[in-house]
Amino acid sequence: MFPWLAYGHISPYLELAKRLTDRGFAIYICSTPINLGFIKKRITGKYSVTIKLVELHLPDTPELPPHYHTTNGLPPHLMATLKRALNGAKPELSNILKTLKPDFVIYDATQTWTAALTVAHNIPAVKFLTSSVSMLAYFCHLFMKPGIEFPFPAIYLSDFEQAKARTAAQDARADAEENDPAAERPNRDCDSIFLVKSSRAIEGKYIDYLFDLMKLKMLPVGMLVEEPVKDDQGDNSNELIQWLGTKSQRSTVLVSFGTEYFLTKEEMEEIAHGLELSEVNFIWVVRFAMGQKIRPDEALPEGFLERVGDRGRIVEGWAPQSEVLAHPSTGGFICHCGWNSVVESIEFGVPVIAMPMHLDQPLNARLVVEIGAGMEVVRDETGKFDRKEIARAIKDAMVEKTGENTRAKMLDVKGRVELKEKQELDEVAELLTQLVTETTQSSN
């Protein structure tokens, strides 16, 4: 397995690895030492025998020392540098494939150049998409049918979001063409297969549309959410869960924007005022880019912490997200709608209060609304979030009748996903076994 260098990618790879080893596979996960350190403590018991970690060392440069060989805490201006460094590690990855001789490779959909390496070693390979299928369907449609409206109107980008998305898409296309020229891409049967962190229960029509549009075979592997476990993060984690236990059922909202997006001061102020106006309990996870010397109280409105008192908790850097979402006192989740956060919300039946920031997040937010898993905080005409709109969305989700309806829909979605998960994983295990058999037979 070869994931992209982000915690939000490597976590689903680990969960998929666990489910495949339950079905008789042995797995190697290849990544940088700092990323492997993040998951090492989560490989326990029987999995410590069937899941092995393989270090991939990127070129070490003054501007990208080893602790920056991950997107977690990476200053945004170094993202392109990290991508170039990973591309520069192709020879080492090739040597790893030569040494391990795996039966097949599962690689990140963003790292398309991996396929050419696997061809050189006669190893079948499939892509793994850790984002939503609806997002991929939307952008593939724009590329294949420019000027024609996407056939699913619930999934759209506002004018403000389209401008940002166009720039990101152009950069991604240029990066892909530089490191994986279209003329050099292999065209094996397995190269049209995507494993996807999703379920037909929520994205079936988008899975079918991608096959109709581009003959891409999208195979769902379920939501791949780790079971809540007590994390070894010391007294702060224990104190937070104890505090949550003093609150009434579904009275508290979790606020978190993932490991890669850093809120501006203006965004933090609007969210803070929105939480204050809503009058609900909250846990707010705040993060600053690595190296920034800012205390949370310096970034928040003056007097905010004193005014909210015991109604809220500010946590810097990390909180046991799955444990908080699984807690009966949690009734809502204000998030950026990174795909991992969306599927965790579905897994634990907690309505989403969507505040998408960039990349795939706006499209994920629209899917959340479409399937009834939450509501979106609408930006103003300038593309900014407003405190009153934030407070309104929180109250709708947590206090008003709409919140009860959303919770009921969320539980229905959760049930439908759970019904399909085992069958979907069994089908994927069967297909991977078949790929290996066919490759072995063709080599003999």
Swiss-Prot record:
CDD domains: GT1_Gtf-like. UDP-alpha-D-glucose binds at residues 130, 319, 321, 336, 339-341, 344, 360-361. The active site is at 9 (proton acceptor), 108 (charge relay). Its EC number is 2.4.1.330. The keyword Glycosyltransferase applies. Keywords: Glycosyltransferase, Transferase. One of its GO terms (biological process) is carbohydrate derivative biosynthetic process. It catalyses: beta-D-glucosyl crocetin + UDP-alpha-D-glucose = beta-D-gentiobiosyl crocetin + UDP + H(+); bis(beta-D-glucosyl) crocetin + UDP-alpha-D-glucose = beta-D-gentiobiosyl beta-D-glucosyl crocetin + UDP + H(+); beta-D-gentiobiosyl beta-D-glucosyl crocetin + UDP-alpha-D-glucose = bis(beta-D-gentiobiosyl) crocetin + UDP + H(+). GO terms for molecular function: UDP-glycosyltransferase activity. SUPFAM superfamilies: UDP-Glycosyltransferase/glycogen phosphorylase (SSF53756). It comes from the Eukaryota. It is an enzyme of class 2 (transferase). An anthocyanidin binds at residue 9. It holds the Pfam family UDPGT. Ubiquitous. Gene3D superfamilies: Glycogen Phosphorylase B. InterPro entries: UDP_glucos_trans (IPR002213), UDP_glycos_trans_CS (IPR035595). Coiled coil: none annotated. The keyword S-adenosyl-L-methionine does not apply. Belongs to the UDP-glycosyltransferase family. Crocin is a yellow pigment that accumulates during fruit development. No other crocetin glucosyl esters detected in neither flowers, leaves, nor stems. No correlation between mRNA expression and pigment accumulation. Glucosyltransferase catalyzing the beta 1-6 glucosylation of the sugar moiety of crocetin glucosyl esters to produce crocetin gentiobiosyl esters. Weak activity toward curcumin glucosides, but no activity with flavonoid glucosides, coumarin glucosides, 4-nitrophenyl glucoside or crocetin. Involved with UGT75L6 in sequential glycosylation of crocetin to crocin (bis(beta-D-gentiobiosyl) crocetin). This is Beta-D-glucosyl crocetin beta-1,6-glucosyltransferase. It comes from Gardenia jasminoides (Cape jasmine). The lineage of its organism: Eukaryota, Viridiplantae, Streptophyta, Embryophyta, Tracheophyta.
